[in-house]
Amino acid sequence: MNKEFIKSIVVSSPWEKVEIARHKDRPTGKYYIDNIFKDFIEFHGDRLFGDDKAVIGGIASFEDISVTVIAITKGANTNENIERNFGMPNPEGYRKALRLMKQAEKFNRPVICFIDTPGAFCGVGAEERGQGSAIANNLFELSRLKTPIISIVIGEGGSGGALALTVADKILMLENAVYSILSPEGFASILWKDSKRVKEAANVMKITAQDLNEFGIIDTVIKEPRGGAHKNPQKQVTLIKKELMNAMNEMKNIETNQMINERYDKFRKIGTLE
């Protein structure tokens, strides 16, 4: 990633970025599917329990390339947020996503994921249906999937709920998105027993796209319109399409075994210190 570009990004505090990432008008995963791809056909269900509306997935066309596209999505209003469980998937959502990814592998389609979730749903029903095993199985299967995977964090990337769709060859992240093991509120409550220290927690956690790019956890920071993606959603679509095409071009000539080995090495290196 170009260091001068990173420096040119409008500087906001980590907590300000959290607030922008959570903004009620921020474009959703569904919005990006509708505006970036053509001929989207949605598939439903995990073939085990039901259809989780927090996860949208199907096949589509991107620049005349057939792709599988999956999004963990919030709603654009209160009613949609209730329908989509505020972007918190149940186990059947992760199993649906994996079903579509395995189908993409079978038909040699690249997989493109959009991530916007505060985390996996932690209700009793979700736990009874195997939330932990659903996420763990995704991590395992994505690590060896024989087709390119590109994941884009567009808002909140919360904990294992986000990681379940970000074991990818290329991880892109919007300028004001955040990606972390838990929320700043949760971090402050656990570490300091004081949920009011959220701004301090956000600083300590290194959750911004710029920090994560510097650490090598993500590959590309996608610039946003001044003030955030919600200020000019169509401009944001254009910026995402450009970086998505760049990522796909980088992946198209990589041999399958090399791709899987590089994906494995990418995640094994996370957390190493020089």
Curated annotation (Swiss-Prot):
Q: Where in the cell is it found?
A: Cytoplasm
**Which terms are listed as keywords in the entry?**
ATP-binding, Cytoplasm, Fatty acid biosynthesis, Fatty acid metabolism, Lipid biosynthesis, Lipid metabolism, Nucleotide-binding, Transferase
**A GO term from the CC aspect:** acetyl-CoA carboxylase complex
Q: Which GO terms describe its biological process?
A: fatty acid biosynthetic process; malonyl-CoA biosynthetic process
Q: In which pathway does it act?
A: Lipid metabolism; malonyl-CoA biosynthesis; malonyl-CoA from acetyl-CoA: step 1/1
Q: Example GO molecular function term?
A: acetyl-CoA carboxylase activity
The EC class name is: transferase
* EC numbers for this chain: 2.1.3.15
Catalyzed chemical reaction(s): N(6)-carboxybiotinyl-L-lysyl-[protein] + acetyl-CoA = N(6)-biotinyl-L-lysyl-[protein] + malonyl-CoA
Q: Which residues form the CoA carboxyltransferase C-terminal domain?
A: 2-250
Q: Which SUPFAM superfamilies match?
A: ClpP/crotonase
Q: Which domain of life is it from?
A: Bacteria
Q: Name one Pfam family in it.
A: ACCA
Query: What InterPro entries does the annotation carry?
Result: Acetyl_CoA_COase_a_su, ClpP/crotonase-like_dom_sf, COA_CT_C
Q: Can you tell me which family this protein belongs to? A: Belongs to the AccA family.
Q: Fill in the subunit field for this protein.
A: Acetyl-CoA carboxylase is a heterohexamer composed of biotin carboxyl carrier protein (AccB), biotin carboxylase (AccC) and two subunits each of ACCase subunit alpha (AccA) and ACCase subunit beta (AccD).
Please give the function described in this protein's UniProt entry: Component of the acetyl coenzyme A carboxylase (ACC) complex. First, biotin carboxylase catalyzes the carboxylation of biotin on its carrier protein (BCCP) and then the CO(2) group is transferred by the carboxyltransferase to acetyl-CoA to form malonyl-CoA.
- The name under which this protein is listed is Acetyl-coenzyme A carboxylase carboxyl transferase subunit alpha
In the UniProt record, the gene name given for this protein reads accA
